[in-house]
Amino acid sequence: MASQLDLIGGDYIAGISINPPTNSRVTSVYSEVQASRIDHTLPLPSVFKTPFKIIDGPPSSSAGHPEEIEKLFPNLFGQPSALLVPNQSNEVSSDQKLKIGVVLSGGQAPGGHNVICGIFDYLQEYARGSSLFGFRGGPAGIMKGKYIELTSEFVYPYRNQGGFDMICSGRDKIETPEQFKQAEETVTKMDLDGLVVIGGDDSNTNACLLAEHFRAKNMKTLVIGCPKTIDGDLKSKEVPTSFGFDTACKIYSEMIGNVMIDARSTGKYYHFVRLMGRAASHITLECALQTHPNITIIGEEVFEKKLTLKNVTDNIVDVIYKRAENGYNYGVILVPEGLIDFIPEVQQLISELNEVLAEGNVDEEGQWKKNLKKETLEIFEFLPQTIQEQLMLERDPHGNVQVAKIETEKMLIQMVETELEKKKTEGTYEREFMGKSHFFGYEGRCGLPTNFDATYCYALGYGAGSLLQSGKTGLISSVGNLAAPVEEWTVGGTALTSLMDVERRHGKFKPVIKKAMVELEGAPFKKFASQREEWALKNRYISPGPIQFKGPGSDARNHTLMLELGAQA
């Protein structure tokens, strides 16, 4: 057992603990649903019900530029993925006592606690006497040596619960030589056999860099990743989905369904709902499939069709006009958080504004506008006044326009209002237009995980534990065959380098795990596209209601996953 000094990772004065670890969750105040979830027994893939062994697949490559990835990961590139299969006897010794660290990295996603519980329970079952340590506050906890030993009593209140508050997360990256040295010193001092990094694409890229660094130094610490992000953009053939996506989409869809019924009840509002997903539009697409809104904007389609901001606005106005002819003066419109990043003309505007702002020649009379290209100025003038002001005033520490702070849904409402007013003046539109804006984001990150996410995460944790015990490093825990019953799920590990490509930054190649964007030829988008015209003019609203843990719908997987796996028409 680690000493109190070890448990707090060095926060002490003269041997006296400043902040001894306490369990911040008090189960006595849990709701009935929370309490019932703690003791909910999770099924496991059948491979964990018998002795198993791990078999290697063929050598792997990368998602792009294999020659550059090989240079960046000389010790890991080409290593095979791994698969757990039943065996006559376990090939790993249950007498092996391991010291494993786990870290949560990046934004929250429902199910993270169950990954940790899965690792913990795996060690209890297959490597008795092992220790699991949680690094506090994300990767910074590794660099600063802040950790706590996780015990059965400590993890118990977090089983099947939302949030990341068991050990908390952070957005720090281990990327400079000094930071790698700090991580090296921490895992060496703790004598860790393995480290599990639970995170998204950036975090798992970092996990692979750590694995390469430790291997190059002949250190015994192995590194395994786990796929986390509600955005759903960390996936591949071997990693079918990232955890948290299922829960977040169902939380958002419940709220969208409620808004739809409100729209129909009042008969006078258009609800513009912005949804999380700064890069890919997976959440927006999935919520559309679950609820059938009147209009859904998919960023990848906007980019593919080279639509302008005016095109997007005109499309919305056209649907509103046609619905008014049918007697409907209300509706629901879904907008992805990252829409602006998909419109090249807006990116050009932001680029030129950054140059103007950097020169500091912004005068109240507007003479600075002469520095913009003609077509860029037209875009700027097309924007509502409030958005123009936001672009000029909201800057990050580097002086650049803060695109993420632009409330796209409010911008679209104002632009639609302007266009409809023009139609009124022309005498072609008579109805009143009232837009209501919503942003559904943080509400979806820490909800109680669905049965699917809870079970999937638990299996990911078991998978990570088995990979570490078998001596694997530089893999991401992978659970497949997800359309089948849980007992038939497959468990293994996918080479992180196989998911990677490179980007040129500051004259050097940097490894990145490629984000999985919405594929316009993929089954989820095709199903949506085949039905959206009907949804636009008729009310085919679905109100999914709250997430269910028992009874009808409780074990349903999301449409995106089932369509991509070919398990849904």
UniProtKB/Swiss-Prot annotation:
Site (Important for catalytic activity and substrate specificity): 202
Record: residues binding substrate: 229-231, 268-269, 276-278, 337, 442-445
Keywords: Allosteric enzyme, Cytoplasm, Glycolysis, Kinase, Magnesium, Metal-binding, Transferase
Positions annotated to bind Mg(2+): 201
A GO MF term: metal ion binding
A Gene Ontology biological process term: photosynthesis
Cofactor(s) demanded: Mg(2+)
Site keyed Important for catalytic activity: positions: 228
Reactions that this protein is recorded to catalyse: beta-D-fructose 6-phosphate + diphosphate = beta-D-fructose 1,6-bisphosphate + phosphate + H(+)
Active site residues of this protein: 231
EC number(s) given by UniProt: 2.7.1.90
Pfam families per record: PFK
Localization in the cell: Cytoplasm
Pathway: Carbohydrate degradation; glycolysis; D-glyceraldehyde 3-phosphate and glycerone phosphate from D-glucose: step 3/4
Coiled coil: none
Binding site for diphosphate: 107
Highest taxon above the source species: Eukaryota
Cellular compartments per GO CC: cytoplasm
Activity control summary: Allosterically activated by fructose 2,6-bisphosphate.
Subunit structure: Tetramer of two alpha (regulatory) and two beta (catalytic) chains.
Similarity section: Belongs to the phosphofructokinase type A (PFKA) family. PPi-dependent PFK group II subfamily. Clade 'Long' sub-subfamily.
Family annotation (HAMAP family): Phosphofructokinase_II_Long
UniProt xrefs under PANTHER family: PYROPHOSPHATE--FRUCTOSE 6-PHOSPHATE 1-PHOSPHOTRANSFERASE, PYROPHOSPHATE--FRUCTOSE 6-PHOSPHATE 1-PHOSPHOTRANSFERASE SUBUNIT BETA 2
Stated role: Catalytic subunit of pyrophosphate--fructose 6-phosphate 1-phosphotransferase. Catalyzes the phosphorylation of D-fructose 6-phosphate, the first committing step of glycolysis. Uses inorganic phosphate (PPi) as phosphoryl donor instead of ATP like common ATP-dependent phosphofructokinases (ATP-PFKs), which renders the reaction reversible, and can thus function both in glycolysis and gluconeogenesis.
Official protein name in the record: Pyrophosphate--fructose 6-phosphate 1-phosphotransferase subunit beta 2
Organism from which the protein derives: Arabidopsis thaliana (Mouse-ear cress)
Phylogenetic lineage: Eukaryota, Viridiplantae, Streptophyta, Embryophyta, Tracheophyta
